[in-house]
Regions:
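Short, low-complexity disordered leader/linker segments with a strong preference
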Residues: 1-65, 88, 363-366, 371-373, ...
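Hinge/lid segment of periplasmic solute-binding proteins
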Residues: 51-58, 124-175, 189, 196-200, ...
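C-terminal lobe and pocket-closing loops
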Residues: 289-301, 310-403
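Short, well-ordered beta-strand elements
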Residues: 59-71, 93-98, 120-121, 165, ...
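Conserved C-terminal helix/tail region of periplasmic/extracytoplasmic solute-binding proteins
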Residues: 184, 257, 380-432
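Extracytoplasmic "Venus flytrap"/periplasmic binding protein-like
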Residues: 81, 85-153, 181-192, 283-284, ...
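Glycine-centered hinge/linker elements that transmit conformational signals in sensory
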Residues: 201-205, 238-266
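Periplasmic solute-binding protein
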Residues: 130-137, 154-190, 215-237, 257, ...
């Protein structure tokens, strides 16, 4: 992008309406280890115009701090790239980013909110968005961003009581990855239903190779991977002690009982699961878009492909990704100006392409991966991707769900009992 254009863009972004804040001055979360301020070499962004958006006021100037939790070097470099480009093309706003480990995110946010020491923008995991919005930490930006072309799931994750408290950064979803050679050797087709998945997983299990796995950690990461089973039955995230919820737990148990699903998966992150798959220890797995760049680089000769997650009654996938949120009472106008730039078409495409994400803007996503059949499966599945929550109490609800499937996988509880226990916790949280 030309220097002259970005300067004009920022000036235009400074021309109009005043942002409506939603609460007291506070600031945003931090994620990943070693809080460090990013400075990286500047690279060049696409030499095309940034899209216009609802302008900010004349007061857009000063420093803007962003908190983020990505620990992957490529993610950090991509964010730094657009920040350095933005800073280098105008002199009214200076943006800097600070990394905080994901494990420390909630603690840092809570402490920062109490002490009045928060940033101006936060990039956060989308299921956590509603809980922070309910605390009054995020600014209401309903009238500042047009999200009519965004996928419903990402927008819902930014919305509370009909108001928009953030903008989707980028999205990802889950699909079935499969080893083509292992399925062919077992004489199996790609499974489309639960029954077919159980059959194929059983037939491809032999020696040290398990037929199927997904991350089953007792935390949000595990819940993310488990919930597509529940949604596929037609139940919601809050209906675990239901016909469909129990059926989902029973299906998980059937995979374990068949010896096709490793109990060790309760200790596996999504990255661990991917490593097991590319090492030849899994025939199939559930995982997301962000693994593709690594897989293509590390195992270029491995024959693998992707397909929709096998279904019960209906197709379902889990919506992942992050959102941007502006901190109420921070440097809101300058934060808005930067986010207008960051969410414009060419800047968004740069970020998505370098991070393996799908744009949350459907008009961008539909052309993002033309010619790439693997990524296109993920794009097609976005219409079936469900957001976790969004409720302010979601983190506690997620804990109850992950405890349930963990107990079933380890054999510490049967599906019906685990579902009843989880439901009792969920009902107490949402006030039923």
């Amino acid at each position: 992008m030309k220097k002259r254009f970005l300067a004009t863009f920022v000036s235009a972004v400074m021309l109009a309406t005043v942002l409506t804040g939603c609460g007291a001055a506070t600031q945003a979360p931090a994620q990943e280890t070693a809080a460090k301020e990013e400075t990286a070499e500047t690279t060049e962004v696409a030499d095309t115009q940034t899209e216009e958006a609802v302008p900010a006021s004349d007061d857009a100037s000063g420093d803007v701090t962003i908190w983020y939790y990505w620990e992957t070097a490529g993610h950090q470099e991509a964010l730094d790239h657009i920040i350095q480009e933005f800073n280098g093309q105008q002199d009214k706003i200076k943006v800097q980013a600070k990394y905080v480990p994901f494990a420390d995110f909630k603690k840092q946010l809570s402490v920062g909110a109490s002490a009045g020491e928060l940033p101006d923008i936060v990039i956060l995991d989308n299921p956590d968005h509603a809980s922070y919005a309910a605390m009054g930490i995020f600014a209401d930006i309903t009238d500042r961003f047009d999200v009519s072309n965004y996928y419903p799931g990402p927008v819902n994750s930014c919305t509370l009581d009909g108001k928009l408290y953030g903008v989707p950064f980028g999205s990802n979803d889950l699909v079935l990855f499969y080893n083509e050679d292992m399925l062919a050797e077992a004489g199996c087709e790609v499974p489309k239903t639960w029954d077919e998945l159980l059959d194929v997983a059983t037939k491809t299990t032999k020696g040290n190779v398990y037929g199927f796995a997904h991350c089953a950690l007792q935390n949000e990461e595990g819940t993310f991977n488990f919930l597509p089973w529940v949604w596929s039955t037609g139940q919601t995230s809050y209906e675990i002690n239901s016909e469909g919820g129990i059926k989902a737990l029973e299906f998980e148990k059937s995979l374990v009982d068949a010896g096709a699903f490793p109990k060790e998966a309760i200790n596996w992150t999504q990255g661990d699961t991917m490593n097991q798959f590319i090492s030849g220890n899994l025939a199939m797995m559930i995982n997301g878009t962000w693994q593709i760049p690594t897989m293509r680089q590390e195992v270029p000769d491995l024959k693998w492909n992707v397909a929709p997650i096998p279904q019960d009654k209906q197709q379902a996938s889990g919506l992942g990704g992050e959102n941007y949120a502006v901190i109420a009472g921070g440097n809101e106008e300058a934060a808005i100006a930067f986010l207008k730039y960051a969410t414009s078409k060419d800047t968004c495409l740069y970020m998505m392409d370098h991070m393996g994400y799908i744009s949350s803007d459907s008009t961008i996503a539909k052309d993002q991966f033309k010619g790439d059949a693997v990524y296109q499966v993920f794009v097609d599945e976005m219409q079936y991707a469900n957001a976790r929550g969004p409720l302010p109490e979601w983190p506690d609800i997620s804990d109850a769900i992950s405890l349930a499937f963990n107990k079933v996988i380890t054999g510490d509880s049967d599906p019906a009992s685990a579902a009843a226990e989880a439901q009792a916790t969920i009902d107490s949280i949402i006030g039923k």
